[in-house]
Regions:
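Short amphipathic alpha-helix that is part of the acyltransferase structural core
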Residues: 1-25, 35, 40-43
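Conserved beta-strand in the GNAT
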Residues: 37, 42-60
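A short, internal acetyl-CoA/4′-phosphopantetheine-binding micro-motif in the GNAT/acyltransferase core
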Residues: 59-67
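Conserved acetyl-CoA-binding loop-helix of GNAT-fold acetyltransferases
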Residues: 67-80
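Conserved GNAT acetyl-CoA-binding A-motif
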Residues: 82-96
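Conserved catalytic-core motifs of GNAT/GCN5-like acyltransferases
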Residues: 94, 104, 109-124
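PLD-like (HKD) phosphodiesterase/transphosphatidyltransferase domain
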Residues: 134-205
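HKD (HxKxxxxD) catalytic microenvironment of the phospholipase D
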Residues: 231-276
């Protein structure tokens, strides 16, 4: 019976919500894994599985219960079982990029290197059960590395991860409106989640000029849906393609498949903010956007 309940949770979260193909969701590892089921009273709210090797995954919490700390409770249960029953020294997982702040909060270390799993950007995370975080990879303000991102998965993963870290604001300077990042559903959803997550958050989008049909661009359509949180301005001074997530995050897009990123160079981020933030105030609203607002 518990297996059926777990199956329903995974179907709801992974297959229906995240659009993971069913043939990728179900595998032979389910037979050998230890399965965890989180209950609120008698109501199932989440699940996870742990392999004998110490790798865990398929961790899911139903949408309506995600602000109730069930993810951390599942992690604690996995750690306890791995430590006392399996007697293993390390647990590992392939974490979705947007969930990295959650794993860091729970003491996990992150391995640099984004990869695709079922069409979703992931990173490997690991932890010695009961031990604190021991490295600063992808830790805002502490990680001084400069990262070269060499494919769309990495560019999207960085965008998802950085916006999930709740920066004070996000500035998107978009000199090339055809760049694949800003047509990617996962990247756009990360922008939407960030903007919708708090009434204090703001996304400021800058474009160099207007073009016919600009209101059909995904960024403009997103702005129309969240006009109180997202603004678009036109300025001929926009010559770069960057995502600034102050006070510590910066992604500079150098081509369609490449970008340079940092989350520890505060002076560089401050310089880029000083360059682009005034343009978000002095730039003009797109004419098509003004017509739509009438």
């Amino acid at each position: 019976a518990s297996r059926d309940v777990i199956r329903k949770i995974r179907e709801e979260v992974f297959i229906k919500e995240q659009h993971v193909p069913p043939e990728l969701e179900w595998d032979s590892h389910d037979i050998e894994a230890v399965h965890f089921l989180a209950l609120e009273g008698r109501n199932p709210v989440g699940c996870a599985r742990l392999m004998p090797s110490g790798k865990f995954g398929r961790m899911a919490v139903l949408r309506e219960h995600r602000s109730h700390n069930w993810g951390s409770r599942l992690i604690n249960a996995i750690e306890d079982y791995a430590r006392h029953e399996l007697k293993i020294r390390e647990i590992r997982a392939a974490a979705q990029a947007h969930a990295i702040p959650f794993y860091q909060k729970n003491g996990f270390n992150v391995e640099a290197g984004f990869f695709d799993d079922a069409g979703i950007a992931h990173l490997n995370v690991y932890k010695a059960p009961g031990a604190p975080e021991t490295n600063y990879v992808f830790n805002p303000g502490r990680d001084s590395n400069l990262y070269s991102l060499d494919d769309v998965t990495s560019l999207v993963g960085w965008t998802e991860m950085m916006l999930a870290m709740r920066p004070r604001r996000a500035i998107i300077a978009c000199s090339d409106l055809h760049h694949p990042l800003w047509w990617n559903h996962a990247a756009l959803d990360a922008v939407r989640r960030f903007a919708a997550g708090s009434h204090r958050r703001r996304v400021k989008i800058l474009i160099p000029s207007e073009m016919g049909g600009i209101n059909r661009h995904p960024l403009l359509r997103l702005q129309q849906r969240l006009s109180s949180r997202i603004s678009v301005r036109v300025s001929a001074e926009v010559r770069d393609d960057v995502l600034i997530t102050g006070p510590w995050g910066l992604l500079e897009l150098t081509s369609e498949m490449h970008g340079i990123a940092t989350m520890g160079d505060a002076s560089r981020v401050k310089k880029m903010e000083a360059l682009y933030l005034p343009l978000t105030e002095t730039g003009q609203r797109p004419k098509e956007a003004r017509r739509l607002a009438l």
